Curated annotation (Swiss-Prot):
The gene is ssb. PROSITE patterns: SSB. This is Single-stranded DNA-binding protein. The keyword Ribosomal protein does not apply. Keywords: DNA damage, DNA recombination, DNA repair, DNA replication, DNA-binding, Repeat. It comes from Thermus aquaticus. The lineage of its organism: Bacteria, Thermotogati, Deinococcota, Deinococci, Thermales.
Amino acid sequence: MARGLNQVFLIGTLTARPDMRYTPGGLAILDLNLAGQDAFTDESGQEREVPWYHRVRLLGRQAEMWGDLLEKGQLIFVEGRLEYRQWEKDGEKKSEVQVRAEFIDPLEGRGRETLEDARGQPRLRRALNQVILMGNLTRDPDLRYTPQGTAVVRLGLAVNERRRGQEEERTHFLEVQAWRELAEWASELRKGDGLLVIGRLVNDSWTSSSGERRFQTRVEALRLERPTRGPAQAGGSRPPTVQTGGVDIDEGLEDFPPEEDLPF
């Protein structure tokens, strides 16, 4: 089993002054909404920028320390992890993946270019949006092709985590998507295989057949590597490293799950 690795690094601008609240047990919760744009070169050699909006959650003493100090438009660095949560509401099982901050720090914004979106929210150009994961596949890869013939694969990744002071391991179930040559390479993997993923965090939203709005946070892979366990697994083809133009939508804050649907 691959060792668990779960890291998120973000640099973006605060779209609004953060909200702080408390659980019934007195735990402070500070929610930060960050916005930025990822820049990369697509297959045709053209430079593209894709906007993103991510909600980051800070708990405990750090939440109380920063609660009154942060303002809309500030440039913020976040180091954290992806956290999978599952709960039940009205007899229906629900789940979400959120960014849990371990550390945040305001950055100097001088010389950094921001723009305003259609809702008047500041968004940082050439932001940082990086996720590094290592875990094991929970199912065989699902390879498909778009009508234009572009390969795309969906992967389920289980990342085990044991944090200091915790006796039991916790498993985070995360979704990964890869495109083109990287997708075709990943399609040869099988359930249980270890995988190192380096990519960017994106939010999907869609309307189900029943008319419900659905949300999913996933990782779009920019690089995949197969961990080896001894000489027997050291061979095999090396995965391509690609810069993908797979996401082409303006993912807005309206795509976040409503607060009443969250566990606290």
